[in-house]
Amino acid sequence: MVSSWRVQQAAREVKAGAVIAYPTEAVWGLGCDPWNEDAVYRLLALKSRPVDKGLILIADNIRQFDFLFEDFPQDWIDRMSATWPGPNTWLVPHQDLLPEWVTGQHDTVALRVSDHPQVRELCALVGPLISTSCNPAGRPAAKSRLRVEQYFHNELDMVLGGALGGRKNPSLIRDLATGEVVRPG
């Protein structure tokens, strides 16, 4: 396990506009502050990912997403709460409360409360975080720090070392309003 001071250093970097790599439940992730437009566009450029596709936000606990849930039915909140923390990503209406560089051309945003200890510690310090697989578009997601370095060599501000969470597949993605599975887990 990476020492807490490294996670604190990563939090300082993110707050300063950094793009970082870190281990998640199944693959390495790239992340940054969702409110920092320059950081998000830099992350998108590193991945060669179009902004219109949208990005996932991860958090330490469901309360970090409360600003989005004000008008949600209680059963929606209960449904998400029953699956978090864990490998479940929900597409929820963003109600124009998030910037376009996060949501892309969608009326929904993807949210997950991670169960990876380092990710949770980092999000507890910085709030919700952009999280996307650590790979250039069209390449397999990094499953090792070596692959992270091969993909992005000196282009990242920080690589937070640590172990993956042991899951074989990325998270399940479901639409909160319809229950439809968008991506199997």
From Swiss-Prot:
User: What gene name is listed for this protein?
Assistant: tsaC
Q: Which keywords describe this protein according to UniProt?
A: ATP-binding, Cytoplasm, Nucleotide-binding, Nucleotidyltransferase, Transferase, tRNA processing
Asked if the keyword Nucleotide-binding belongs to this entry, the reply reads yes
GO cellular component: a single term: cytoplasm
Entry EC number(s): 2.7.7.87
Enzyme class, broadest EC rank: transferase
**Catalysed reactions listed for this entry:** L-threonine + hydrogencarbonate + ATP = L-threonylcarbamoyladenylate + diphosphate + H2O
GO MF annotation, one: L-threonylcarbamoyladenylate synthase
**Places the protein is found:** Cytoplasm
Query: Where would you find the membrane-spanning parts of this chain?
Result: none
Q: Which domain of life is it from?
A: Bacteria
What is the official name of this protein in its record?
Threonylcarbamoyl-AMP synthase
Single GO biological process annotation from the record: tRNA threonylcarbamoyladenosine modification
Question: What is the similarity comment for this entry?
Answer: Belongs to the SUA5 family. TsaC subfamily.
What are the YrdC-like domain coordinates in residue numbering? 4-185
What this chain does, per the entry, is described as: Required for the formation of a threonylcarbamoyl group on adenosine at position 37 (t(6)A37) in tRNAs that read codons beginning with adenine. Catalyzes the conversion of L-threonine, HCO(3)(-)/CO(2) and ATP to give threonylcarbamoyl-AMP (TC-AMP) as the acyladenylate intermediate, with the release of diphosphate.
